[in-house]
Amino acid sequence: MFPRYPRYLWRNTQPKINVIQTPPLRVLSDYQIKIIKDSWEILNKHPVESGQAIFYTFLKRYPEHKKRYPAFRNMTLEELKDTPQIRHHCSRIMEFFGAAIDSLGTEQQRDILVTALSDNADYHGKKGITKEHFIQMRNVMLEVISGACKLDDEEKKAWSDLMDIMYHITFNVLDALNK
């Protein structure tokens, strides 16, 4: 005879798993690459300030992530503005994206993107950064870039396709780390 369990245990008690799908690996057209590079020039005129706008918006929208940064976890968002730590971190973010964007349309594009994004995903994945965190950053980046550069729908699509490429590589590395 099977043991008797309370009725509430008969239901499937497994937690629902929210699986974030890996975006497709897209191919950017020459025109999309031009759109991305032209709008990046706008952001790159003031790279640290652009990086701060992205990172500050990210932390404002998702304050729980501030605890992941020991250098400024105990500061308020207002205290964070223009601190050397935040300026340094934001300049690194912009350098990372700048190198990726500079590689677009070159013969080295694939190698540069795969290497840089794999290293970045490996580093962040080992610190417990998940696909959900990357999606949150993606949404903030697209919003800030779109606003700063006044992108139309076609330009937003180009940036979204670039993010799909970047996150395709990133998510494959994160999946490998979690096996």
Language model: regions and residue ranges:
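Globin-like tetrapyrrole-binding proteins
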Residues: 2-179
